[in-house]
Amino acid sequence: MAFYFDQDDAALEHFDRYFLRQSQEKREHAQELMSLQNLRGGRICLHDIRKPEGQGWESGLKAMECTFHLEKNINQSLLELHQLARENGDPQLCDFLENDFLNQQAKTIKELGGYLSNLHKMGAPEAGLAEYLFNKLTLGRSQKHTRAQTGPTATGCLPLLAPPGGTSMFPFQNILFIFLLSVLPLLAIKLSVLKAIKVSS
């Protein structure tokens, strides 16, 4: 999914980085579960991983919806595993799941729910500008915040716009600035046309 948004016909780099970060987190979670299995003398049984039903996600909104449902399914599986551990009197596994997985899942689901609400309110996917702004202002800012907390990384990014003080502007200021950048060249063209008309007349 991450590399879909890195393609030249999608070109939404912060969607790309967001999904790549999610993929890395899930791989780390799988490694933690396998390490716990080995630590406790168990055996790891691997199963086939089914490929996604769709090869292209068409829009950032559809990709976010797909991710949201996947995260809810993962959360449900973890809850069922927690219930099984509790029924079999395994407090260590219960504690491991609560501290390392379930709390993080709740935060991820809440975050994705907020992203979906914002995309719908902005008119995605019909309004192409909505996904562009969401990519730059929401995902870009959240990745900057993550980078500030964890330090510079290979996938870190700078804010779209920032005043001389270095802190990023509020979203509405970013939107206003982008609007002005798109309108000012048009005004300059109109003025040059008007001057040309006056000169010719």
UniProtKB/Swiss-Prot annotation:
Gene Ontology process terms (BP): intracellular iron ion homeostasis; iron ion transport
Q: Which GO terms describe its molecular function?
A: ferric iron binding; ferrous iron binding
Q: Which InterPro entries does its entry note?
A: Ferritin, Ferritin-like, Ferritin-like_diiron, Ferritin-like_SF, Ferritin_CS, Ferritin_DPS_dom
The chain positions of domain Ferritin-like diiron read 1-123
Question: Does Metal-binding show up as a keyword for this record?
Answer: yes
Q: Family membership, please give it.
A: Belongs to the ferritin family.
- Which Pfam families does the record cross-reference, listed alphabetically? Ferritin
Mind telling me what this protein is named? Putative ferritin heavy polypeptide-like 19
CDD domains the UniProt entry points to: Euk_Ferritin
Alphabetic keyword roster: Iron, Iron storage, Metal-binding
Q: Which GO terms describe its cellular component?
A: cytoplasm
